[in-house]
Amino acid sequence: MLLLQNLYSEENYSINPDLQDNFVIISALHNYDLNPHTASYSAEAQILTGLYEGLFSYDPITLDPLYALVKSYRVSRDKKRWTFILRDDAKFSDGSQITAKDVVYSWLSLIQNPDASYSSFLDIIHGAKEFRLGEGPAENVAIMPVDDYTLSVHLISPASHLPKLLCMPAFSVVKNAENVFSGPFVISERTNDTIILKKNSNYYDAEHVNLKQITLKFSNDELENTYNYNIGTVDWLCSTFNNEKLLSKDSLQLYAEFATQYYFFKIRKESICSNLTLRQALLEATPWEALRENVYVPASTLVYPLNGYPLVQGYIYTDKNEAKLLVSQAKKELQLQEQSELKIKFAIPDTEYMIKKAEILKEAWNEIGVTLEISTIPDYEYLSSISKCDADLFTYTWIGDFADPLAFLELFRGNSTMNVSDWKNSEYDSLLDKAALSTDEEHNKLLSSAEQILLDDAILLPVQHPVSVNIINLNAVGGWAANAFDIHPLKYLFKKETKDMIPNIVMLK
């Protein structure tokens, strides 16, 4: 496989080093987890692109894998044995050499971390799943250093998507030490509302990192955020803003995202939502048109539409009469009296958007005799609270980490570390396993069959395919390009000489 080698650069653009002293980003207020093994939010992944690097990294435009800590690799004839040749000039920020043993340490640390959402992606490696589940030793995991700069990895089955997978921050190379980084920047200062990154002088490609410093500020104050952007003290705004007060409308970057927002049931023995018939009743009664009103791209399925991916039957119609019949049947299956009250709990982030959507469901489900209790959780705590929350229904917005249906379907694999729903289906898992052995048309056909099983089991309510929203003046900033993952590697950013001037506004430098 030939990977892209050229760094992102703007054609014939001369970069002025005098402008690169500081680049200011405002991001949403959040308890940021900057451990690449346990980070789950896309906003965390964005920062991690500047702090850590793995064998591959994202091309900032195409998102194809670029060589990072490797300079080449080869794959055996049976496609199961991968040999990676590491760069011999790569160092950690403390000046120590990065070797194949560091990759082994990093991946084994990821696999054995119970809080690592992405660790099950490495189950494709011999011995990894057993080690993750505590059923086998680390020595049996087929990640082996041949020498200081050669790494051998043995897979259970072919996985042509492996380089794309290894672009993700979770598979970065880390050192067993505090504040040591493998990427283009290091953390210089950190407070509750600010993180300052400094250029990593020991980074192997430091000469192509233009910014000397990046200041990350965290704020959900839309008026203040917009004001600071308007006067030029902020270079990139990716938090809340006031569109009416935004002076430079050309700065609004709105693009389709490889993502889906959906609600899902958590399967718990003590919950009535473990009953399939009741879940089917709730989905039959859902007013899909109202639920998807005022969204950019309505979603009726989980997987974002991809070329070559067969259509599956999603959720598009409402039938309250059928829903009422199903509720009666569900009560019999649950051994409840016909007059028994049915209550389920929906835990949501405390945002105006989600409160409105939850009220739509509450009203609709009340008409079929089901009471929906709505519980709010602070937005910045929501994702981490799901595993320990006793609610029945939750909301998720998932951005695919690589361009394959598996990026979504892995969320519901029975033993996946990303499966927070606790739904399990052996036929579904088997189809995912078979798809890993297949390519192209057959691969997609198997995965679409798996998705149909998931949808038929009424475990989720697809709502929308979100769009990414960023405020950034591309006449003033280079190295930034819209893409389907809304990931913009910090390494490539730089300030341009030209900057749009807005009448009657003093631009602060």
What kind of region is each of these model predictions?
Residues 26-77, 108:
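N-terminal lobe/hinge region of extracytoplasmic solute-binding protein
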Residues 274-363, 449, 504-507:
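Append "and occasionally in soluble cytosolic enzymes with long acidic Gly/Pro-rich linkers
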Residues 188-196, 215-269, 393:
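Extracellular/periplasmic solute-recognition and catalytic clefts
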Residues 470-509:
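Long beta-strand-rich cores associated with HINT superfamily self-processing modules
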Residues 60, 139, 149, 154-213, ...:
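Gly/Pro-rich hinge or "lid" segments in bacterial periplasmic/extracellular proteins
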Residues 102, 111-112, 117-174:
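Surface-exposed binding/hinge segments that line
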Residues 10, 16, 373-382, 407-475, ...:
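Extracytoplasmic/peripheral linker and loop segments enriched in polar/acidic and small residues
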